[in-house]
From Swiss-Prot:
GO molecular function terms noted in the UniProt entry: structural constituent of ribosome
Gene: rpsU
Entries under HAMAP family matching the protein: Ribosomal_bS21
Pfam family, one: Ribosomal_S21
Family: Belongs to the bacterial ribosomal protein bS21 family.
Lineage: Bacteria, Pseudomonadati, Bacteroidota, Flavobacteriia, Flavobacteriales
Swiss-Prot/TrEMBL GO biological process terms: translation
Protein name, per record: Small ribosomal subunit protein bS21
UniProt keyword Ribonucleoprotein present: yes
Keywords, in A-Z order: Ribonucleoprotein, Ribosomal protein
Length: 64
């Protein structure tokens, strides 16, 4: 549960904005979507390796 203390005289829109920002930072929605279906650890690891290789090729192309 997220708790956002509201300061005296604070606008409700600003408090909602702080709540939404804190909610996004916690990654709750991202975590729920990831848990909808089981993904094998080997598949997760393979995806991470492919992503790292892609980022490395982008960095290499920028350097040359």
């Amino acid at each position: 549960m997220l708790i956002i203390p509201i300061k005296d005289g604070e606008n409700i829109d600003r408090a909602l904005k702080r709540y939404k920002r804190k909610f996004d930072k916690t990654g709750t929605v991202r975590q729920l979507r990831a848990r909808t279906a089981f993904i094998k650890p080997s598949v997760v690891k393979r995806a991470q390796i492919q992503k790292a290789a892609y980022i490395q090729t982008l960095k290499d192309s920028l350097e040359s």
